[in-house]
Amino acid sequence: MGVTCVSQMPVAEGKSVQQTVELLTKKLEMLGAEKQGTFCVDCETYHTAASTLGSQGQAGKLMYVMHNSEYPLSCFALFENGPCLIADTNFDVLMVKLKGFFQSAKASKIETRGTRYQYCDFLVKVGTVTMGPSARGISVEVEYGPCVVASDCWSLLLEFLQSFLGSHTPGAPTVFGNRHDAVYGPADTMVQYMELFNKVRKQQQVPVAGIR
């Protein structure tokens, strides 16, 4: 894999989530991007079981268990403000056995799914973020395949993002700053999706105006 940027696209004013997704995908197709299947990234939140916290009033910690269709044999466990563990798909079964330590948060499942597009050396994924039956937002993932060091290709990624996101082009992901000259890996992409999902969850708690 190459270096990837994951961002959220605001819903266009007067449009639905699905209509905004269609506007984005049409822009990509006009650029010459070709459809290459579909993708899905999902996340379920677990919190520390009350029985493990003791009586000192400790705050429980969160763990995010995630899957990415690009890595069908892997499961990603991201600890709050901590490391990312990459395990095989049986990790989900293990979580059931660890219910005395981690418990699934109620109605915590969130996912994004949509279409993959290939444009030259760029792989683009535009997805609809859903919680339960409701569409909650739009995710945009762009991967530049030939490079594995973020600092070597961010300017190129940024230029491509600007070509179809315009004024909604994101800044450099925080994970780039932490690993400026390090080799980029799948865990870095999952951290970005975790941040995006948490942002979408928080936005559901306050009214958000549409964009022009």
Curated annotation (Swiss-Prot):
The keyword Cytoplasm does not apply. InterPro entries: Mediator_Med20. Component of the Mediator complex, a coactivator involved in the regulated transcription of nearly all RNA polymerase II-dependent genes. Mediator functions as a bridge to convey information from gene-specific regulatory proteins to the basal RNA polymerase II transcription machinery. Mediator is recruited to promoters by direct interactions with regulatory proteins and serves as a scaffold for the assembly of a functional preinitiation complex with RNA polymerase II and the general transcription factors. Belongs to the Mediator complex subunit 20 family. This is Mediator of RNA polymerase II transcription subunit 20. One of its GO terms (biological process) is regulation of transcription by RNA polymerase II. Component of the Mediator complex, which is composed of MED1, MED4, MED6, MED7, MED8, MED9, MED10, MED11, MED12, MED13, MED13L, MED14, MED15, MED16, MED17, MED18, MED19, MED20, MED21, MED22, MED23, MED24, MED25, MED26, MED27, MED29, MED30, MED31, CCNC, CDK8 and CDC2L6/CDK11. The MED12, MED13, CCNC and CDK8 subunits form a distinct module termed the CDK8 module. Mediator containing the CDK8 module is less active than Mediator lacking this module in supporting transcriptional activation. One of its GO terms (cellular component) is core mediator complex. The gene is Med20. GO terms for molecular function: transcription coactivator activity. Keywords: Activator, Nucleus, Transcription, Transcription regulation. It comes from the Eukaryota. Coiled coil: none annotated. It is found in: Nucleus. It holds the Pfam family Med20.
